[in-house]
């Protein structure tokens, strides 16, 4: 027997830069979008508008969240895309993917069990462009797992006449058909949150130093 569930994806926007060696952050938050801004870097994160069956809605602008009714074995369109806005200084960018209900996810053999990887749930990650960083971060207290993907090079929008959209982090997701009804019920309402981050490249010796400073300043 096949069951359906709702998978909620929240797109979170974040921006940052360095100024005279100092990082300062301005934050604004509402129920749908968490925006972090600093300096001369601006990004957006969005995805194709789809209906609850995961089908693209023609003529609908890209949006920051979609809701799904899922059936195991069916692929659903989802293409979180980070765009560097024209006029932005050269910046390092990354995307973080956080899933809740991890204690339930790791019990599902079809998703890899304790060896769960994001690729067991989504399709289309271009690993030559988006570089997975080390092991995922597991937060047992909040029951989440987070994967970090850094873009393979700094992106410069300072001399461009148009915004610079990067390749989507992935383009679809699927709940494998071997998932049982009990397993499906356990992850009903699971939330995936995709965060976009950018930090101005100037003033740092490289991307590692930049992200270390970003994480220290924001508590990421």
Residue spans of the language-model regions?
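A surface/secretory-pathway sequence property marking extracellular, secreted
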Residues: 39-56, 101-148
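Short, polar/proline-rich extracytoplasmic segments that appear immediately after membrane translocation
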Residues: 2-63, 68-71, 184-220
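C-terminal, structured domain-capping segment
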Residues: 71-101, 152-220
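Alpha-helical structural elements
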Residues: 20, 63-65, 71, 75, ...
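Aromatic/His-enriched, Gly/Pro-containing loop or helix-boundary segments
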Residues: 58-70, 145-160
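Acidic/proline-rich low-complexity IDRs
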Residues: 14, 19, 25, 95, ...
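Broad hydrophobic/π-residue packing in well-ordered secondary structure
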Residues: 22-28, 36-37, 81, 94, ...
């Amino acid at each position: 027997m096949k069951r359906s569930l709702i998978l909620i994806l929240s797109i979170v926007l974040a921006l940052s830069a360095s100024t005279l060696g100092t990082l300062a952050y301005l934050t604004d938050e509402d129920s749908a979008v968490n925006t972090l801004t600093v300096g001369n870097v601006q990004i957006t994160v969005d995805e194709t508008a789809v209906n609850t069956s995961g089908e693209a809605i023609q003529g609908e602008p890209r949006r920051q969240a979609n809701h799904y009714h899922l059936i195991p074995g069916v692929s659903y369109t989802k293409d979180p895309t980070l765009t560097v806005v024209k006029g932005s200084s050269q910046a390092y960018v990354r995307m973080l993917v956080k899933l809740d209900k991890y204690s339930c996810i790791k019990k599902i053999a079809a998703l890899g069990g304790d060896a769960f990887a994001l690729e067991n749930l989504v399709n289309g990650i271009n690993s030559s462009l988006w570089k997975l960083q080390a092991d995922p971060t597991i937060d047992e207290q909040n029951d989440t797992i987070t994967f970090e993907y850094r873009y393979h090079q700094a992106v410069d929008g300072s001399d461009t006449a148009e915004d610079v959209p990067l390749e989507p982090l992935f383009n679809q997701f699927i709940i494998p058909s071997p998932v049982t009804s009990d397993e499906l019920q356990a992850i009903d309402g699971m939330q995936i949150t995709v965060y976009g981050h950018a930090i101005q490249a100037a003033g740092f010796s490289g991307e590692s130093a930049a992200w270390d400073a970003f994480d220290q300043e924001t508590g990421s």
